[in-house]
């Protein structure tokens, strides 16, 4: 491990936060000289996974606010698979502001804390946080931007894991650049999820001379993320993010770069409670191949949703800290392009990975 830690604060102690926190324990003593399943980088620059320390957390759920972060990871509606025991942290979950963070389905399911919201900026300063990770529910536009501004005001880097367009918004990007504060965003990809497999296969079609004519991706899951997304009013940015992540990777053809088109349908579809934190994705691509002959591909992907994202966030956090160490402000392009669905700059995945590896070693 390095001689310094990465002091991480979390906004939203749901399943994704749980998998990240447990994952740090699971990989705390991973050998950097070995290829370790589940990690792209045991050491990311000078930082080992075990260098991550959680120093603050914010939530609005009455069952999570005021209790130790370790206990909060297993409280209320959290339902992901357990991969490690988390010792008591000595960090109690703080009451964050609600703003638009609770949709109708959340309000019908959980009790909102009656505690007074804390001063988030001061809490981040007091915790000496290096990086703030936003894990708020989809549709939390106002709340996510509140935490983004809090990160700027507190002088800590920001990792935007949800589909609210901040790093990819020129005005917000300028705010972070002017403040000298790094941001990695927007909307975390999973390690092997529906988005990364769909975009890679769509590009493969085109690179092999097959035109992508139509495609769809239907996702179902049982966690609160999927229940929250039953509210279609909160879903617009998610559909845009997932769709452009796929179509931006198609270099040519009728669907290239399309966000809205009758021949593209990508997005969450339904909530199936007994799936818990599992997600099932059904993907179909229809194309035109040699001689105008149709060629179709259909597949189903089954994953535990939150550990699948934690394997990416664990690198995003370390990329943000490296940028902070180097005094780099604004969107961290190599990390955002490789790790996020809606970065400021969409790149082919192989190119984005090369740039990220170069960033790590300062090439």
From Swiss-Prot:
Q: What does this protein do?
A: Key enzyme in myo-inositol biosynthesis pathway that catalyzes the conversion of glucose 6-phosphate to 1D-myo-inositol 3-phosphate in a NAD-dependent manner. Plays a key role in oxidative stress resistance as its product is the precursor of the protective antioxidant mycothiol (MSH or AcCys-GlcN-Ins).
Per UniProt, the keywords (alphabetical) are: Isomerase, Lipid biosynthesis, Lipid metabolism, NAD, Phospholipid biosynthesis, Phospholipid metabolism
Indicate what this protein is called per its UniProt record. Answer: Inositol-3-phosphate synthase
Q: Which gene encodes it?
A: ino-1
Which cofactor does this sequence's record say it needs?
Answer: NAD(+)
Q: What happens when the gene is disrupted?
A: Abolishes synthesis of myo-inositol and mycothiol (MSH or AcCys-GlcN-Ins). Increases cellular protein carbonylation in response to reactive oxygen species (ROS). Sensitive to ROS-inducing agents, including cumene hydroperoxide, hydrogen peroxide, menadione, cadmium chloride, nickel sulfate, iodoacetamide, methylglyoxal, and 1-chloro-2,4-dinitrobenzene. Sensitive to the antibiotics ciprofloxacin, streptomycin, vancomycin, neomycin, and rifamycin SV. Leads to a mild growth defect in inositol-less media.
- Cite the annotated pathway: Polyol metabolism; myo-inositol biosynthesis; myo-inositol from D-glucose 6-phosphate: step 1/2
Native organism taxonomy:
Bacteria, Bacillati, Actinomycetota, Actinomycetes, Mycobacteriales
Provide the species name. Corynebacterium glutamicum (strain ATCC 13032 / DSM 20300 / JCM 1318 / BCRC 11384 / CCUG 27702 / LMG 3730 / NBRC 12168 / NCIMB 10025 / NRRL B-2784 / 534)
Q: Which GO terms describe its molecular function?
A: inositol-3-phosphate synthase activity; NAD+ binding
């Amino acid at each position: 491990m390095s001689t310094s830690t990465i002091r991480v604060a979390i906004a939203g102690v749901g399943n994704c936060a749980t998998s990240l926190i447990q994952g740090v324990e699971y990989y705390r003593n991973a050998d950097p000289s070995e290829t370790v399943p589940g990690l792209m980088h045991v050491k990311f620059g000078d930082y080992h996974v075990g260098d991550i320390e959680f120093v603050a957390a914010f939530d609005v759920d009455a069952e999570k606010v005021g209790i130790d972060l370790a206990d909060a990871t297993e409280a209320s509606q959290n339902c992901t698979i357990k991969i490690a025991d988390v010792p008591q942290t000595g960090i109690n979950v703080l009451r964050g502001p609600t703003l638009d963070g609770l949709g109708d389905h959340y309000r019908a399911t959980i009790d909102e804390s009656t505690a007074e919201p804390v001063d988030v900026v001061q809490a981040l300063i007091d915790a000496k946080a290096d990086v703030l990770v936003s894990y708020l529910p989809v549709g939390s536009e106002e709340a996510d931007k509140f935490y983004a501004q809090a990160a700027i005001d507190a002088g800590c880097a920001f990792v935007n894991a949800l589909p609210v367009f901040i790093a990819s918004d020129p005005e917000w990007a300028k705010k972070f650049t002017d403040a000298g504060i790094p941001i990695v965003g927007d909307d975390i990809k999973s390690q092997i999820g529906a988005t990364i497999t769909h975009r890679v296969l769509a590009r493969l079609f085109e690179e092999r001379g097959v035109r992508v004519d139509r495609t769809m991706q239907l996702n179902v899951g049982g966690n609160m993320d999927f229940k929250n997304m039953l509210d279609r009013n909160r879903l617009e940015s998610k559909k845009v993010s997932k769709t452009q992540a796929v179509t931006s990777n198609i270099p040519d053809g009728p669907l290239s770069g399309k966000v809205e088109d009758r021949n593209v349908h990508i997005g969450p579809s339904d909530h199936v409670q007994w799936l818990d934190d599992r997600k099932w994705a059904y993907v179909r691509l229809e194309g035109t191949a040699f001689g105008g002959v149709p060629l179709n591909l259909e597949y189903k992907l089954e994953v535990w949703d939150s550990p699948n994202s934690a394997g990416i966030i664990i690198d995003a956090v370390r990329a943000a800290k490296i940028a902070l160490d180097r005094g780099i402000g604004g969107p961290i392009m190599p990390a955002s392009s490789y790790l996020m669905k809606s970065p400021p700059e969409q790149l082919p995945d192989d190119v984005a990975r090369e740039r990220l590896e170069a960033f790590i070693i300062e090439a």
